[in-house]
């Protein structure tokens, strides 16, 4: 899925117009301080383009966290983002304390030329996602008439619409698909992300290696299935490897992650790999722990020895890392989605860190390396490798759905050309 048949910002006339732009400012925060501004920085080129080309105003809207339709300004306000954006743009940013309603509409109706406005968190309104929870935590659904009113109010804030929120492109939320303006264009970040994935999946360099980690097989079935039609090699690591190893090798896995549902289709996936000539690499040894805890006692195990009862595998061992390194060395293109161990904890980070080192090495010899967002992007931030790989996606769920071969609603909703 690419933007080849969709309107993009570089083809949009913004002169004298109010641009309402959906961005993804869902950034990690600690004590109201932004801990990683990657997503804010990523939106700057689109914002600057509008200002440089004479836009009357740029009105930015985003979500932050999961307030589930309840206003929680103490916990999920976008106000800290306004300050960060001001320093990145080098100009004032007007922060509004809501995203819809008459006060917001008035503030956005006729601003001074070149004004940048940031709206408060879209998800303080249940009409953004269509469902949420009330103040007591009970599930609620938004009323259709109120969803229409919410979308109509957002549509009044601009003359043209730009969507640069790749990280939310897989969500059919009001701000993604419900703004009713004659021209709806994809921003530069959206374009960059989609072009990267389109080229990787539609005309890959070969050998093409997928590295798939993470916990549950069931969550990754569609991903594995779709990638088996595209890649030459696949590393299956992380927690989901135990389900494969138990089914295929009858390995004793102790209390390691085991996915009952996913186990049912392991053999089908392996048969498909064989039919398509895809070489699969699974881990052969492990760093184990006596409990799921950062300070657990650690041990070693192999597929042959098995993991003893009461113990669990939380990282791959050095022999596995060697096998992974060999696969990486053969590749001319790599897509990596999901860590291969509990990288957040020092004792179980070595497998993912040594794999990252190999991927960085591969990049420097000309291999195309794409990191699907989410946890793997967090690894890049942790080890400062964001500029040492070809592309770090800003969207975990969105990149996953592209790799699964799905159509993204936020892209589908843009104007055709």
UniProtKB/Swiss-Prot annotation:
Places the protein is found: Cytoplasm, Cytosol; Mitochondrion matrix
Modified residues (Phosphotyrosine): 76, 196
GO-annotated biological processes: canonical glycolysis; cellular response to hypoxia; epithelial cell differentiation; gluconeogenesis; glycolytic process; negative regulation of acetyl-CoA biosynthetic process from pyruvate; negative regulation of angiogenesis; plasminogen activation
This protein's name: Phosphoglycerate kinase 1
UniProt subunit comment: Monomer. Interacts with kinase MAPK1/ERK2; the interaction is direct, occurs under hypoxic conditions, and promotes its interaction with PIN1. Interacts with peptidyl-prolyl cis-trans isomerase PIN1; the interaction is direct, occurs under hypoxic conditions, and targets the protein to the mitochondrion by promoting interactions with the TOM complex. Interacts with mitochondrial circRNA mcPGK1 (via its 2nd stem-loop); the interaction is direct and targets the protein to the mitochondrion by promoting interactions with the TOM complex.
GO CC, alphabetical: cytosol; extracellular space; membrane raft; mitochondrial matrix
UniProt feature coiled coil, ranges: none
Example GO molecular function: phosphoglycerate kinase activity
Sites of N-acetylserine modification: 2
Modification N6-malonyllysine, positions: 131
Chain residue ranges for the region called Mitochondrial targeting region exposed following cis-trans isomerization by PIN1 and recognized by the TOM complex for mitochondrial translocation of the protein: 38-43
Sequence positions that bind Mg(2+): 215, 218-219, 375
GN (gene name): Pgk1
PTM sites of type Phosphoserine: 2, 4, 203, 354
Parts of the chain that traverse the membrane: none
Binding, AMP: 215-216, 220, 239, 313, 344
InterPro entries: Phosphoglycerate_kinase, Phosphoglycerate_kinase_CS, Phosphoglycerate_kinase_N, Phosphoglycerate_kinase_sf
Recorded catalytic activity of this chain's protein: (2R)-3-phosphoglycerate + ATP = (2R)-3-phospho-glyceroyl phosphate + ADP; L-seryl-[protein] + ATP = O-phospho-L-seryl-[protein] + ADP + H(+)
Residues where ATP binds: 215, 220, 239, 313, 344, 375-376
EC top class, as a word: transferase
One Pfam family this sequence matches: PGK
Annotated positions binding CDP: 214, 219, 238, 338, 340, 343
Residues modified to N6-succinyllysine: 6, 48, 191
Co-factor(s): Mg(2+)
Annotated residues for binding of ADP: 214, 238, 343
């Amino acid at each position: 899925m690419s933007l080849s048949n969709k309107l993009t910002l570089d083809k949009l006339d913004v002169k004298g117009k109010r641009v309402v732009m959906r961005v993804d400012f869902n950034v990690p925060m600690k004590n109201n301080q932004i801990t990683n501004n990657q997503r804010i920085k990523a939106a700057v080129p689109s914002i600057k383009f509008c200002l440089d080309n004479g836009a009357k105003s740029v009105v930015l809207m985003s979500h932050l966290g999961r307030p589930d339709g309840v206003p929680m300004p103490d916990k999920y306000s976008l106000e800290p983002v306004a300050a960060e954006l001001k320093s990145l743009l080098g100009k004032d940013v007007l922060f509004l304390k809501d995203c819809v309603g008459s006060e917001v509409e008035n503030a956005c109706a006729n601003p001074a030329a070149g004004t940048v406005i940031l709206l408060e968190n879209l998800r303080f309104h249940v009409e953004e996602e269509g469902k949420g929870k009330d103040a007591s935590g009970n599930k609620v659904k938004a009323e259709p008439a109120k969803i229409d009113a919410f979308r109509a109010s957002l549509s009044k804030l601009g003359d043209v619409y730009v969507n640069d929120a790749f990280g939310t492109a897989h969500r059919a939320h009001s701000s993604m698909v419900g703004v009713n303006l004659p021209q709806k264009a994809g921003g530069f970040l959206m374009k960059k992300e989609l072009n990267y994935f389109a080229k990787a999946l539609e005309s890959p360099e070969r050998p093409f290696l997928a590295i798939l980690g993470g916990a549950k097989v069931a969550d990754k079935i569609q991903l594995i299935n779709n990638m088996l039609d595209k890649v030459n090699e696949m590393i299956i690591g992380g927690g989901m490897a135990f389900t494969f190893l138990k089914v295929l090798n009858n390995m004793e896995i102790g209390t390691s992650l085991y996915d009952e549902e996913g186990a049912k289709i392991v053999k089908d996936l392996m048969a498909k790999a064989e039919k398509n000539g895809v070489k699969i690499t699974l881990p052969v040894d492990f760093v184990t722990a006596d409990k799921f805890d950062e300070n657990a006692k650690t041990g070693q195990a192999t597929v042959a020895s098995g993991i003893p009862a009461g113990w669990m595998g939380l990282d791959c061992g050095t022999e596995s890392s060697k096998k992974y390194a060999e696969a990486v060395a053969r590749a001319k293109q790599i897509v990596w989605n999901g860590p291969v161990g509990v990288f957040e904890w020092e004792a179980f980070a070595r497998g993912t860190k040594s794999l990252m080192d190999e991927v960085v090495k591969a990049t420097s010899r000309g291999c195309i390396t794409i990191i699907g967002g989410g946890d793997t992007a967090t690894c890049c931030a942790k080890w400062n490798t964001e500029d040492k790989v070809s592309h770090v996606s800003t969207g975990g769920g969105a990149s996953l759905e592209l790799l699964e071969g799905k159509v993204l609603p936020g892209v589908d909703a843009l104007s055709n050309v």
